Amino acid sequence: MERQCEALVIGAGPAGLAVGACLRRCGVPFQIVEQAGTIGASWRQHYDRLHLHTDRGHSALPWLDFPKGTPRYPSRDQVIAYLDQYAEHFGIVPHLGQLVERVQLRAGQWITTSGTSVYRSKHVIVATGYNAVPHRPDWPGREIFGRRLLHSSEYRNGKAFRGQDVLVAGLGNSGGEIAIDLCEHGARVALAVRSALNVIPREILGLPVLALSIALSRLPPRLADALAAPLIRLIVGDISTLGLRKLPVGPITQIETTSKVPLIDIGTLRLVREGRIAVLGGVRALGHGGDVTFDDGSVRRFDAIVLATGYRPGLEKFLEPGLCAMSGTPGQDGLYFCGFRISPTGMLRGIGVEARWIANDIVSKGRPQ
């Protein structure tokens, strides 16, 4: 089956829905394809305890706020309900179960192939998300470990781990919250942390930390970090006393230079201070019977490891190598990316900014010169 449209959006998560809404507002005909059988599929697959680490006021998509009564930090299920409402509000009906296999530019037109369907469009907006393909460390000994080894994308809750020794590898925002969840379900938890990091509180003086980040975003990153540092240190404390190493640069500089976000602490550090979560070094290798060898040569035995080791976009599956960089001139030849930039002002807020810009740029290119 062949379909023709002005703009094709790939992905029906927050970024794809936001782009669809903005295109709808601008009167641009579009279609959305999604490989899963539902919108917001990645959110539906997240662990049960997940809440937004950014507040609802700065996390709504364009033109529609979260419903009244939603708590400051919405739960996974509340975000899913919001995405469903968002799609219905803007009349967005994606083509579901459409795995995009190839996107090619031919004679000034984008040809997108998905199974037996071919989409021809003037513009393509890739909105498949930064967290598409789980990253799994290639540690020696994985084949003989003999214990449960799962990625955070496969983790649901800590019920099955009660009374067990569980290692969470990685201390990003997923790793920090999963460690809390395991503790709350009665597991004995340790964190494997190799890299230095920044830790920021979720709130400062009762205000969401994102509000401060947005206020400081117009300043040079190092100056913004210098202004925020005293408050952050006052609230977070000295993480070196917990066996953690602080990055030499502040959190805003970290995001701008590495595209990696700091840990937004929602209670992990308190559990470390209370001795309920141990902090260990990086993992060197796995061994028989659940043995884990760490960078310092020490060996400990665990019943399970949760890999909170991140994701990669996986765009090479359907984009030619020269198109995968997500760099260059935005909208060049009609190709756009939404939801891949890590912003100090919040991922969902950034998606909204990008979606508006993309829609406006498409409209401007359609006007007579």
Predicted regions and their residues:
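Flavin (primarily FAD) cofactor-binding/catalytic cores of flavoenzymes
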Residues: 2-36, 40-42, 71-173, 177-207, ...
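A short acidic, helix-capping loop that chelates divalent metal ions and anchors anionic groups
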Residues: 65-71
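Redox-cofactor-proximal catalytic regions of oxidoreductases
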Residues: 38-65, 93
